[in-house]
Amino acid sequence: MSEPPQPPGKPSANAPKPAPRLKSIKPTTPGDANKITTPTIPSIKTKKEFKPNIPTARKKKDEKDPLSGAISDLISASLSPLAVVGDRPGKPNATSSGKFRSNLNPNRKKPAAIPITNLFQTPLVQAETQQPQSTYEMNKKNEKKDSDLLAQLFHEMEVDPMQPFHPTHLPLVDPRKIMKAYSLDDASKDLNETKRELEEKIKNGELSDTTNFTLNSIGSEDNNNNGGGSGQVKFVESSKKKNKEISTKDKPFYVEDQFLNKDKLFFIQLPNLLPSTQSKPNFNIPNPVLPPPKPTTITKTVTNPDGSITTTTIPINENTKIEDQPPPPPKELDEKAFVPVIYPGDFPPSIKEMPSGKLGTLKIYKSGKSILKIGTVEYDISSGDKLKFLEEVQCFQTKGGPDNSPTCYTLGIPSQHLVAAPIISQISGI
């Protein structure tokens, strides 16, 4: 039998039960985004979770700790490990409210961590801006200023620094203020006196005239700030050498400050071409020696068998034989004969073609500077390279030994090599 029709709103008793629909998974609060709730189904048993309970007695004991207070909180905070730069903050506790900050962008970029190497570097702070950490440093700076002022007073008052506790009279005026009264007239007098001293040194050979000097005005900052325009004028050497003493290279005849003036040989190197000037005078020029005139006739003497002698005169022509011509008379110099004088500009400027004899004059100054004068040209002599092997000075004579045999004489070992360079600035007329 068929079942009676049921009303449309009520299901039949034998109809299967529909499956329960799953609820949508949504977090209850924004803070529980990581917590997912599972749907509850009546036929499935839920798993129980174990949650330990804290005993109430222990809880009460912690609350009634006698060491609790502000001091214990400071001690615990000091014993807690410090966070290292670059560590990420921990996750928020479950008890925190799960509210997001409204002004925080969740897609923002994370700040870059500071490298650990930069943590141990010194801060970029000038030393002048750092304040002294204690009164000890301040007293130390004040003592340094006082010592500098005393050193300046010792220098100006000619006080012996080895006896700083010796009684003395200090000036009533600061010596730094005396410089303001230094007038231009005093500066010009000092300038002329310094110039005269330099000229005397150059004349004596103690100082070279090729050294450049410049005038510099030396004035303190206090004078410029207070309107003082006058400053002390001094000669300042513009060369890089701060030591004004003559170097060992400019003392060619000295070895370890000992003058080699006895039984010493020196090797002086001269240039291949020597500069010379036309110093031949234009007056009292001697006439050159003229050769004797050629004979026009030839005289012959013939001895006859009788013993008589006959002389014949034959004129010299182109057809005359050479045998018939007389030999030239020998050239003999008498005491009154003219000897030509050699002037510095007459010979070629080379060492090989120079006339033998006296070469020049050597001048050695007290300062050690040496100048060789050849003719009218002066040469500056300086020490050359040191001897690196054995050198001997020898003299050869072609006919000095027995039976007119050649002989060699050893004179000695040269003490030093010297180099002669012409002083071009003093040559005039080249």
Curated annotation (Swiss-Prot):
It is found in: Nucleus. One of its GO terms (molecular function) is DNA-directed RNA polymerase activity. Pfam families: RNA_pol_Rpc4. Residues 1-10 have a biased composition (Pro residues). GO terms for biological process: transcription by RNA polymerase III; tRNA transcription by RNA polymerase III. InterPro entries: RPC4. This is DNA-directed RNA polymerase III subunit rpc4. It comes from Dictyostelium discoideum. The gene is polr3d.
